[in-house]
Amino acid sequence: MSIKILIQRQQVNYIVRSFSAQERAFMGLPKNYIGINPGYWAKGDEVKNIFIEYDHFKPIAFFDITSAGAYLNAAVGVYNSEQYRNKGYAQKVVQRGLDWYRANKNELGNKPMYWWAKTDNPASCKLAEKCGFKQETCIFDIWFGYIYF
C-alpha cells in the first residue's frame, strides 16, 4: 500500500471515528470500530482512488472507490458534526470521484460502480440517487444496491 493511500486511509478513519454506533452500522462497520483493520479494508492494490474534502486542512468528507471483483465499490462519509452535515460536502466529494471514474472507465475495465446503502439509511439512498446512481437490487430487505455505469 502506498504512503499516499495510507495517509488517505488515516484521514478516512478520522472521519469514521466521529460517527455514532448507528452510523457505523449504516456503513456495515462494527460498533467498536477504531481505525484501519488490514483484514477489513481493501488491500492497497484494490484501492482505486480516495477523494477527500477538507475544511482548513481538516478532512471532513470522503468518497472511497475500491475494486470488488466484477464491479467497483463506493463508500462515502461526512464528519459527524452539525457544522458539516447537510451542507453538500458529500455530494461534492462524490461528484469529484465520479468525474475521475468517467475519465478512467476504460482503464478500470469498464466495471460498473456499486453503492450499498442500508434500507434504513434514507440519507445515503437519497444521496446515491441525487448523484446519478440507480437502484438495482435489494438484499434480504437490508441493503439497497445502487449502480453507476
Residue ranges and their predicted role:
Residues 21-24, 28-73:
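Acetyl-CoA-dependent GNAT
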Residues 72, 103-119:
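Conserved GNAT acetyl-CoA-binding A-motif
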